[in-house]
């Protein structure tokens, strides 16, 4: 029988770096997490995962089976370097090839959701043409994802193009495809001048997962939980009351910390305490 408890996961970059997924999933299990979200970022090291051999992919699947800790989602931030909105045709083609490989990888290892970065371009100047190319790139990507039965989900970003659920819903309506949904980050959502609770309510029916982190205006990473502007309890209450029953993912970048496991355990306890206050989990 499937568990009715709320799935709580941890971001790969919160845990010690390395390529041994069996060790990573064992640690996540020890720390009490249900799943780990894989990162495929713009570094050559993590991009190379998309070229893993059949044996390497099977090793990941076997690690999931052995530990019981799932890897249901991928954070695909590689498109910062190879954006779908690039005016350089070669760069844009690389971006689409990364998307194709990511979808194939997801299909092979059982990843259900690929979180997309909502940048038309990142290191270049945006304009109407970059936005048009980005829209067209998303359309092509969703067609590939549909055939593979893999969901593409747009993150709410640290970037004006996609800094609210309302804006992301515009793309969902434009694409009009069940394999394109939303993956909001309540930290990013709170760092902008958004009515956060109204935005979360607007996204219900399209939200497939939620990133949990703290932020400050203009500061989107490495803000310790409780030191930023996010009203976690209200966000959790709103999502619960709106009928959201999906996973929550604690997003941290503690892989280079002196003791990543201790940092993660501290964050886990803090987040679960706020979830308990919101009536989502039993108090420890």
Curated annotation (Swiss-Prot):
Pfam families: AP_endonuc_2 (PF01261). Catalyzes the isomerization of L-xylulose-5-phosphate to L-ribulose-5-phosphate. Is involved in the anaerobic L-ascorbate utilization. Its EC number is 5.1.3.22. InterPro entries: L-Ru-5P_3-Epase, L-Ru-5P_3-Epase_Enterobacteria, Sugar_Epim/Isomerase, Xyl_isomerase-like_sf, Xyl_isomerase-like_TIM-brl. Induction: Induced by L-ascorbate. Repressed by UlaR. PANTHER family: ISOMERASE, L-RIBULOSE-5-PHOSPHATE 3-EPIMERASE ULAE. Pathway: Cofactor degradation; L-ascorbate degradation; D-xylulose 5-phosphate from L-ascorbate: step 3/4. It catalyses: L-ribulose 5-phosphate = L-xylulose 5-phosphate. Keywords: Isomerase. Belongs to the L-ribulose-5-phosphate 3-epimerase family. It comes from the Bacteria. One of its GO terms (molecular function) is intramolecular oxidoreductase activity, interconverting aldoses and ketoses. The keyword rRNA-binding does not apply. This is L-ribulose-5-phosphate 3-epimerase UlaE. It comes from Escherichia coli (strain 55989 / EAEC). SUPFAM superfamilies: Xylose isomerase-like. One of its GO terms (biological process) is L-ascorbic acid catabolic process.
């Amino acid at each position: 029988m499937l568990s009715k408890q709320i799935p709580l996961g941890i971001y790969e970059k919160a845990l010690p770096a390395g390529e041994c997924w069996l060790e990573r999933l064992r640690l996540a299990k020890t720390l009490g997490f249900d799943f780990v979200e894989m990162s495929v970022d713009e570094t050559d090291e993590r991009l190379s995962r998309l070229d893993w051999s059949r044996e390497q992919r099977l090793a990941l699947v076997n690690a999931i089976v052995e530990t019981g800790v799932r890897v249901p989602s991928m954070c695909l931030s590689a498109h910062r370097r190879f954006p779908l909105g690039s005016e350089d045709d070669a760069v844009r083609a690389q971006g689409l090839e990364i998307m194709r490989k990511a979808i194939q990888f997801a299909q092979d290892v059982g990843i259900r959701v690929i979180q997309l970065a909502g940048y038309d371009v990142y290191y270049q100047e945006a304009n109407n043409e970059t936005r048009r190319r980005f829209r067209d790139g998303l359309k092509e990507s969703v067609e590939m994802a549909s055939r593979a039965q893999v969901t593409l989900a747009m993150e709410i970003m640290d970037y004006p193009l996609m800094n609210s659920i309302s804006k992301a819903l515009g793309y969902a309506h434009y694409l009009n495809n069940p394999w394109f949904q939303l993956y909001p980050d309540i930290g990013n959502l709170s760092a902008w001048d958004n009515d956060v609770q109204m935005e979360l309510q607007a996204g219900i029916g399209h939200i497939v997962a939620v990133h949990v982190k703290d932020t400050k205006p203009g500061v989107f990473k490495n803000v310790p939980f409780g030191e930023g502007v996010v009203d976690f309890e209200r966000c959790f209450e709103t999502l619960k009351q709106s009928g959201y029953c999906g996973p929550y993912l604690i997003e941290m970048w503690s892989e280079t910390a002196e003791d990543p496991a201790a940092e993660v355990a501290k964050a886990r306890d803090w987040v679960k305490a706020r979830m308990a206050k919101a009536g989502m989990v039993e108090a420890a």
